[in-house]
């Protein structure tokens, strides 16, 4: 949102990242001037990215070739892009063995220029994946060094997400990507960060429900005592996962904890 972007810009954050070009263009129209990475660049949105100086993630040769073609058509040169490497997530990204071909393709054109190279950690928030995380970091470091050696300008590197920032300080390189941590969510211990937002609602109705009766879908909320149940007008459509039900989470009502009942 604009409010989050404005706060980050005021604190001189180097880069913002959004999912699609439309989000980036809306921030530009609202006055955000910070550099913006587009993490899911649509093939139909290249013109928008050029016009609003929105820098796309590039994860495949097909996307790279289409972007270069669009840039040449618009007369765009040296447009910054962000190269994604697949070091183990196996969703999007160039494989490390693609690096020689990628470098060759980048060097025989002038439309785009690599501004950063990055990857995504699979399990940085879990001790059980530490060996794999270290393998990812080593793979990334080797491939990114190969890319950097081919170009005279500095190419930024980033692989750490919120948990990675906390647990792998030696892998912070030149940038990090703070996501959940921006909102005070600590995916590792839930102890280091403080929540920065509060979701407030109102109570629509209160009813007394007898012991052994149930509340909610599939009769999941079985009552082991006579209970007073409050209904509130928010749920999974507002981002509350159904798995938070049956006492897993709670609301604060007049300063007292009221656990969720049902799912």
Predicted features and spans:
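Active-site anion/phosphate-binding pocket segments in diverse small-molecule metabolic enzymes
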Residues: 5-6, 10, 20-25, 41-44, ...
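Active-site-proximal beta-alpha core segment in soluble small-molecule metabolic enzymes
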Residues: 1-158
């Amino acid at each position: 949102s604009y409010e989050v972007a404005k706060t980050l810009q005021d604190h001189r954050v180097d880069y913002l990242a959004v999912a699609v070009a439309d989000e980036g263009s809306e921030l530009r129209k609202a006055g955000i001037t910070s550099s913006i990475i587009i993490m899911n660049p649509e093939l139909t949105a290249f013109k928008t990215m050029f016009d609003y100086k929105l820098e796309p993630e590039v994860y495949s040769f097909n996307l790279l070739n289409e972007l270069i073609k669009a840039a040449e058509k618009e007369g765009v040169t040296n447009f910054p892009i962000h190269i994604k490497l697949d070091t183990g997530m196996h969703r999007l990204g160039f494989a490390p063995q693609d690096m020689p071909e990628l470098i060759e393709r980048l060097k025989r054109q002038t439309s785009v220029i690599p501004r950063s190279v990055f990857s995504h950690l699979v399990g940085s928030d879990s001790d059980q994946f530490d060996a794999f995380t270290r393998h990812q970091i080593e793979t990334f470091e080797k491939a990114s060094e190969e890319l950097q050696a081919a170009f005279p300008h500095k190419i930024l590197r980033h692989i750490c997400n919120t948990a990675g920032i906390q647990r792998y300080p030696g892998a912070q390189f030149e940038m990090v990507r703070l996501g959940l941590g921006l909102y005070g969510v600590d995916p590792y211990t839930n102890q280091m960060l403080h929540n920065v937002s509060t979701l407030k609602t109102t109570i629509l109705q209160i009813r007394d429900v007898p012991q052994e009766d149930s509340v909610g879908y599939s009769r999941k909320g079985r009552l082991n005592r006579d209970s007073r149940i409050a209904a509130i007008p928010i749920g999974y459509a507002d981002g509350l996962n159904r798995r938070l039900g049956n006492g897993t989470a709670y609301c604060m009502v007049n300063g007292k904890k009221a656990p969720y009942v049902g799912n």
